[in-house]
């Protein structure tokens, strides 16, 4: 007579349950127990908590912020990423610069960044924030890149970038946070940006605007051709010099 496999399996399961309830011998890790245990490290647990609750400080100065404001609505719903907008830099660990950074707003941006607790991250959103955009050629007040002021972790090119691009930047930032360690955060690391850290060979030239424009020879005495063309009278101090030139 062949044994019943179903009855043997139920007997084994009953025996395992009795050992768990009253272990007379050295216990073994059963399948039920292994499925309810999570093995991790302090770094992974800490990074998981931080990347799941990034609190951004919204710094919108131009039209790129309109695209970011679309994320707050129900269509995109950026709350599902754990992003909670904060109005105080002391409660935020992420600042998103959306729009043109001007010389007047640069000190305020740097101060907000310095007031944020460590570790902190920066996302540069839009062409105007990254390189100055359409204001980079002739504007006298636009900063040519926010990374001249604060270190940037993720760049989002576009004019303006779509909300989907912002989600992609958030995902890339979450991957960066997940790879960090507590030992790296405990040491003070100097963050450099592309301009000050790149060696270059530049020739120093004398300034063009020295404030002595009125002291130039052409301003002290108008050229002869100019006086003759517009019919100016020759100053008495230059009359003798004119006579010498004509002789």
Curated annotation (Swiss-Prot):
Record-linked HAMAP family: NDH1_NuoB (MF_01356)
Q: InterPro entries under this entry?
A: NADH_UbQ_OxRdtase-like_20kDa, NADH_UQ_OxRdtase_20Kd_su
> What are the recorded GO MF terms, alphabetically?
4 iron, 4 sulfur cluster binding; iron ion binding; NADH dehydrogenase (ubiquinone) activity; quinone binding
The membrane topology noted for this protein in its Swiss-Prot or TrEMBL record is: Peripheral membrane protein
Q: Which reaction does it catalyse?
A: a plastoquinone + NADH + (n+1) H(+)(in) = a plastoquinol + NAD(+) + n H(+)(out); a plastoquinone + NADPH + (n+1) H(+)(in) = a plastoquinol + NADP(+) + n H(+)(out)
Q: What is this protein called?
A: NAD(P)H-quinone oxidoreductase subunit K
Q: Which residues bind [4Fe-4S] cluster?
A: 63-64, 128, 159
What is one cellular component GO term in this UniProt entry?
respiratory chain complex I
Q: What is its EC number?
A: 7.1.1.-
Checking PROSITE patterns in the record gives:
COMPLEX1_20K (PS01150)
What are the boundaries of the region Disordered?
Answer: 218-247
Give the lineage. Bacteria, Bacillati, Cyanobacteriota, Cyanophyceae, Oscillatoriophycideae
Q: What organism does this protein naturally occur in?
A: Crocosphaera subtropica (strain ATCC 51142 / BH68) (Cyanothece sp. (strain ATCC 51142))
- Would you indicate the residue range of the signal peptide? none
Q: Which cofactor does it need?
A: [4Fe-4S] cluster
* Pfam families associated with the record: Oxidored_q6
Task: Provide a GO biological process annotation.
Answer: aerobic respiration
Describe its function: NDH-1 shuttles electrons from an unknown electron donor, via FMN and iron-sulfur (Fe-S) centers, to quinones in the respiratory and/or the photosynthetic chain. The immediate electron acceptor for the enzyme in this species is believed to be plastoquinone. Couples the redox reaction to proton translocation, and thus conserves the redox energy in a proton gradient. Cyanobacterial NDH-1 also plays a role in inorganic carbon-concentration.
Record keywords: 4Fe-4S, Iron, Iron-sulfur, Membrane, Metal-binding, NAD, NADP, Plastoquinone, Quinone, Thylakoid, Translocase, Transport
Cofactor binding summary note: Binds 1 [4Fe-4S] cluster.
Family membership noted in the UniProt record: Belongs to the complex I 20 kDa subunit family.
Q: Do you know which PANTHER family this protein is assigned to?
A: NADH DEHYDROGENASE, NADH DEHYDROGENASE [UBIQUINONE] IRON-SULFUR PROTEIN 7, MITOCHONDRIAL
Q: Does the keyword NAD apply?
A: yes
Subcellular localization, per the record? Cellular thylakoid membrane
Q: How does it assemble?
A: NDH-1 can be composed of about 15 different subunits; different subcomplexes with different compositions have been identified which probably have different functions.
